Each structure stands twice: as C-alpha cells, then as structure tokens.
Amino acid sequence: MLELVYEEIEEKMGKTLEVFKNDLKKVRTGRASLALLDGIVVDYYGTPTPLNQLASLSVPESRLIVIQPWDATAIKDVEKAILQANIDLTPSNDGKVIRLSIPPLTEDRRKEIAKRVNQMAEEHKVAMRNIRRDANETLKQMKKDGDISEDESFAGKDKVQKVTDGYIERIDEVFKAKEKEILEL
C-alpha cells in the first residue's frame, strides 16, 4: 500500500524535474544551441512540420546556427516560422541556407534571464511541494481508513519529505548550473 504512494511521488517528481530540465534547454544563454529551435513548426505545403524534419541543423560556431532546408523552396516558410516562434533571433537567408546569429547577451539581459530561470525553478519546487501535499493527504486518508497504523503514517510522511527534499535539491543543482552558464561571459 505504502509502496504505491512512494512509487507515485517518485514518478511525478521525476517527471516534474524532466519538464524543468526541458524548459531550461529553451532558455537562451548567449551560446548557440539547437534546443532553441525545438518546437518550431513550419507550415510546409499546408502541413505543420517540425523544423528538424525539413532541414539539417548545425552549430558550426558557438554563436551561429545554420539551417539548411532539404527543399530549397521551403526556405521562406522556414524563415517565417522562425520569426513567428518569437525566439528573439533574426534569420538571414542566402537562398540556400538560413543563418541565425546569436548576439552576445548584455549584462542586464543576463540578469533578467537568470531571474526568469530562478522563477521557473521556484514554480517547479512548488509543483514538488504540491505532490508532497497530495501524498501526505493520501497517507492521512489511509490512516483514517485503518489501512495503515499511526507509526506507518509518520514513517510514510518522513519518507515523502526526504524524497521531496532530494528532488528540490536536484532542481537547485540544475538551476545553479544554468545560472552559472547564463552569467558567465
């Protein structure tokens, strides 16, 4: 009975941590990263198609992303999709390839991004605490229903707290690494 509660919080907290890591991949750090292009969908002959299925993507330099559509006629559609994606990058097109130049971030912009990343970390910590609260409610209900003893309930709450602390610590570690990456020149 208790193992199900533990498995459920491990699974939910693990997913929350993965979502946080994926959200951070999309944050611009001043370095070129193909993760910036994740989620860009191109209207290709009326069909919404992910960018990575229409072109080869590469990072030849630390501040440059090169997009080479396999179909040269799609270059305008790719360019339009990048502009609509609101990633604060302006594509330059030479007819064959699209280049996205990543400008260096100003110190103010770096601090602003770091603040936004901190806010994202806090939101995910709140999600972890909500999962903990739900697990504790489940334990309380199990005790009330007579499924577990009071000792098991206390031990269960203690284990739930330890798991929560562990995941919150991991969110902090991921946040600190990203913050360092953002703030270093």
Curated annotation (Swiss-Prot):
Q: Which GO terms describe its molecular function?
A: ribosomal large subunit binding
Which GO CC terms are listed, alphabetically? cytoplasm
Q: What is its main location?
A: cytoplasm
In this record, what's one Pfam family?
RRF
Keyword set, alphabetical order: Cytoplasm, Protein biosynthesis
- What InterPro entries does UniProt report for this protein, alphabetically? Ribosome_recyc_fac, Ribosome_recyc_fac_dom, RRF_sf
Where in or outside the cell? Cytoplasm
One GO BP annotation of this record: translational termination
Q: Which family does it belong to?
A: Belongs to the RRF family.
Q: What does this protein do?
A: Responsible for the release of ribosomes from messenger RNA at the termination of protein biosynthesis. May increase the efficiency of translation by recycling ribosomes from one round of translation to another.
Q: What is this protein called?
A: Ribosome-recycling factor
Q: Which organism is it from?
A: Desulfosudis oleivorans (strain DSM 6200 / JCM 39069 / Hxd3) (Desulfococcus oleovorans)
